[in-house]
């Protein structure tokens, strides 16, 4: 079996639209949560979100290309371009039939859909864009990446809600591991901060209503947490077989060594209260990596800042790691990023790869009064320098989808 490594990364996020800015802000504990100013929030319970700043699609992609794409595909292409450039791969020197794309989105082009529904209702069918369907479909981002890079290998857009990023990375890892591809773009993207989705999540009482202090709203594991903060962006990684990477003397961020997935089989939106599915995904990932729980040095938690979710993930970690759970730093990137939905797993995998490379665990901010049922070491407030060899990253989604990946420091 082939070993699989990460040779390029690209990010679009509320705390930075390149790896350097993103990482520096993450380890400084900078929050990307702001007041929503893209639509009227007067009648909404939640008025805050993690919004990507200073992103000019026309400048990044060109006006013609940007105009026909929904924002979620724009984010994906921008992140993919960064990752490709970072990897130093040369299309003329690789087999494009073994170049794949595994990139998904949880919601797809909802903004474009709503714009066209409004146009249809107000002005009739002639005002509906002929590019509506290819713009809104969840596989649009993967398709656009495939087209741009002439990637003729395996292509897929997994749809596992907020577990998408890890699902995409894990399935791409499997393909390369078993020799069916040399290089794959893998990750997730999302742009769904519109009035309809904020209203829906808000009415489901899933969102934080801490509108008076946005940067304090996302507070995983804190007793005063009151829901997640919706966010947006994209995280794309270049996965490559080690043999392929070594032949071209590529820079390597980290090695992907394990992947596990499971289903809660419990409820369409609520996580299993005892974290059973989360436990199974983590256990499967460690088994797949052929490592013991004692070998894990850091955990990147899903940790969305919901009452039940944070407790159930803590329970799952303690069930799998036993007493060792109290010795492992557990970081919650969503305390700064908010919940990027389908983009979360890809972005958090990038953060974990950087942690392995730099030996720094990002902090969990806003953890001022820990929930008594959340009693692990969550790296509160300040980043920590730690010797890290192996890291585990969790992503869980509506429908009970769970995916965990294991990364290892490459030496």
Segment roles from a protein language model:
Residues 180-226, 259-273, 303-310, 327-377:
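Acyl-CoA/ACP chain-elongation machinery
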Residues 76-89, 141, 146-190, 228-250, ...:
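Active-site-proximal alpha-helical scaffold in enzymes
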Residues 1-65, 243-255, 350-364, 408-411:
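ACP-dependent fatty acid/polyketide chain-elongation machinery
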Residues 3-7, 34, 212-289, 297-298:
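Condensing-enzyme catalytic core mediating Claisen C-C bond formation in acyl metabolism
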Residues 123-129, 167-170, 174, 191-247, ...:
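Glycine-/small-residue-rich "gating" segment that lines the acyl/pantetheine channel
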Residues 6, 30-160, 189-200, 293-309:
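Conserved beta-ketoacyl condensing-enzyme motif
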Residues 8, 26, 80, 101, ...:
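Conserved small-residue
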Residues 20-27, 111-125, 175-178, 198-211, ...:
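A glycine- and small-aliphatic-rich helix-loop capping segment at beta-alpha/alpha-beta transitions
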């Amino acid at each position: 079996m082939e070993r699989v490594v990460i040779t390029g990364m690209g990010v679009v996020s509320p705390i930075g639209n390149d790896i350097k800015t993103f990482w520096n802000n993450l380890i400084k504990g900078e929050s990307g949560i702001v007041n929503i100013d893209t639509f009227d929030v007067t009648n909404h319970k939640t008025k805050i979100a993690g919004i990507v700043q200073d992103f000019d699609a026309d400048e990044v992609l060109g006006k013609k290309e940007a105009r026909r794409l929904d924002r979620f595909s724009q984010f994906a292409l921008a992140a993919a371009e960064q990752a490709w450039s970072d990897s130093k791969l040369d299309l003329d020197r690789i087999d494009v039939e073994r170049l794949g794309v595994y990139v998904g989105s949880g919601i797809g082009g909802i903004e474009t859909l709503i714009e066209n529904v409004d146009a249809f209702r107000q002005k009739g069918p002639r005002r509906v864009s002929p590019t509506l369907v290819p713009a809104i479909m969840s596989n649009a981002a993967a398709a656009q990446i495939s087209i741009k890079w002439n990637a003729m290998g395996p292509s897929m857009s997994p749809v596992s809600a907020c577990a998408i990023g890890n699902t995409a990375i894990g399935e791409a890892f499997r393909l390369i591991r078993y020799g069916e591809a040399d290089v794959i773009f893998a990750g997730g993207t999302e742009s769904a901060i519109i009035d309809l989705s904020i209203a829906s999540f808000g009415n489901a009482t899933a969102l934080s209503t801490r509108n008076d202090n946005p940067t304090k709203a996302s507070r995983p594991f804190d007793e005063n947490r009151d829901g997640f903060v919706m966010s947006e962006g994209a995280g794309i990684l270049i996965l490559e077989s080690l043999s392929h990477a070594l032949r071209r003397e590529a820079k390597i961020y980290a090695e992907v060594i394990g992947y596990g997935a499971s289903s809660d089989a419990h409820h369409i939106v609520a996580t299993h209260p005892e974290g059973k599915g989360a436990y199974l995904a983590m256990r499967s990932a460690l088994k797949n990596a052929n490592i013991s729980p004692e070998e894990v040095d850091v955990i990147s938690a899903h940790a969305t800042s919901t009452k039940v979710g944070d407790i159930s993930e803590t329970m799952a970690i303690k069930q799998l790691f036993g007493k060792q759970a109290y010795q492992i730093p557990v970081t919650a990137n969503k305390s700064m990023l908010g919940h990027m939905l389908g983009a979360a797993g890809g972005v958090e995998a990038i953060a974990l790869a950087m942690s392995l490379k730099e030996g720094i665990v990002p902090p969990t901010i806003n953890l001022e009064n820990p929930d008594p049922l959340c009693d692990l070491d969550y790296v509160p407030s300040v980043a920590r320098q730690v010797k890290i060899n192996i890291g585990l990253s969790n992503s869980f989604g509506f429908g009970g989808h769970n995916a965990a990946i294991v990364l290892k420091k490459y030496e």
